[in-house]
Amino acid sequence: MKDKLDFYINGQWVQSESSETIEVINPANENIIGHVSAGTKEDINKAVIAASDAFQTFQYSSKDDRIELLNNIVSEYENRYQDFVDTITEEMGSPIWLSSAAQAKTGIKNINE
């Protein structure tokens, strides 16, 4: 079982303001495969403020810096491709072949286009 209870906000993993969780259920077999934090308005506000602050500097980044960032994202995505396939298969209940051949490829495809 995988529990993901923290949020990635402002460059770090932080705990939610709430201890409430939501079950993640595999729709193919109805097994509970993990829990995620339910989050709060305060968690959302922290994330929105962090994103707004980041935009204030990111908007001035160069084209080359942005290309490098996207290339790094693609590289890490490719390194963890099987993790994406496994997670999509569990969370959506889709067959592994479909997760691998189509669904997990969408992320890289969107960046490369």
Predicted regions and their residues:
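N-terminal Rossmann-like NAD(P)+-binding subdomain of aldehyde/semialdehyde dehydrogenases
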Residues: 1-113
